[in-house]
A protein has these predicted regions:
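Short acidic-glycine-tyrosine-enriched beta hairpin
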Residues: 88-90, 102-130
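Sequence-level detector for tyrosine residue identity
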Residues: 6, 16, 52, 68, ...
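Generic detector of intrinsically disordered, low-complexity, polar/charged segments
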Residues: 35-37, 43, 65, 91, ...
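A short beta-loop-beta micro-motif enriched in histidine and acidic residues
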Residues: 48-60, 74-91, 119-120
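A short, N-terminal "cap"/entry segment at the start of jelly-roll beta-barrel domains
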Residues: 1-59, 109, 113-114
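Glycine- and acidic-residue-biased ligand/ion/polar-headgroup-sensing regions
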Residues: 66-67, 84-104
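Tight coil/turn sites that cap or link beta-strands
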Residues: 66-70, 128-130
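Residue-level recognition of conserved beta-strand positions in structured domain cores
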Residues: 62, 75, 100-102
């Protein structure tokens, strides 16, 4: 990803943190990350995040999914004597569309998922507070 695109994603994420009334320190604003999960399609598959804590057992993050971005289902499996991690999502602003294993449960999914190796289409919709 080009540096200009990376910086644009960060700028958009900071706008959404502000809209959602999530207060970040100056240091946290400087440390916003952009993840494209190795797909190179950050506008479709990716997210922006601030990491508060990241240890072998615990991770605390605030994430922004921009309109039409989706976070692919993934796992943090045990490795190198680490027991792995579980993740959970809580929507603070807007709507979040997650796609997980299971029977396809809607006629047409809400996300714009590009042709890729994504194989799960069971849609979970999160609204603020969920």
């Amino acid at each position: 990803m080009k540096l200009s695109e990376y910086n644009e994603q960060i700028s958009k994420a900071l706008d959404y943190f502000e809209k959602a009334n999530i207060v970040l320190t100056d240091e946290e604003k400087q440390n916003v990350e952009v993840a494209d999960f190795g797909k190179g399609m950050v506008n479709d598959i990716g997210l922006q995040l601030v990491v508060y804590v990241n240890t072998e057992r615990v991770c605390a993050k605030e994430m922004v999914l921009l309109p039409y971005q989706t976070c692919p289902e993934h796992k943090h499996i045990p490795s190198n004597n680490a027991s792995g991690k579980e993740e959970t999502f809580r929507c603070r602003y807007g709507e979040v569309y997650l796609y997980v294993e299971g029977e396809k449960n809607v006629a047409e999914i809400k996300a714009k998922i590009p042709a890729s190796d994504i194989t799960v289409f069971h849609e979970v919709v999160l609204k603020p507070g969920e």
